[in-house]
Amino acid sequence: MNKKLIILGKAPVQGKRGIDAKVDYPDCEVWTVGTHRIKNADRYYEFHGLKISPDGPVFRDVSNDVKAVSSLLPVNNSISAMLLEAYFEGYRDIELLGCPMIARDEYLKQKPALAMCIGFCLGNSRDSIQISWDGAPENVKYYEEYQK
């Protein structure tokens, strides 16, 4: 896919909670979960239940490719699942926004899992691939502070 993909988590992006995908990201495809106000997204994933009335297609499951690789990778959160889905569909310019994963369980388990999924995509792609994440760990040893 040549089009840039934005995967939106549930956290505010640049201080905004209410986002209109067609206005805020006009030249991009936008995927999100159906629990917060994102208007005009191209896909809504129902991993957390629907708390809004989506105005685009709703996906309730991931592809068999993602299911197969989840036996090798810790796909324990919706952002990881959507990232792998995008990778297997051929997206090569992906930006992860609104997913800092700073709550305790997210920080300890989901953030490292997403980092591993990003590494899988970057390491296994035969094509040029760009993945940016606004919540990426700044320190490789960030987990150690909870081991004391």
Residue ranges and their predicted role:
Residues 1-148:
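Metal-ion/cofactor- or nucleotide/acyl-coenzyme-handling active-site neighborhoods
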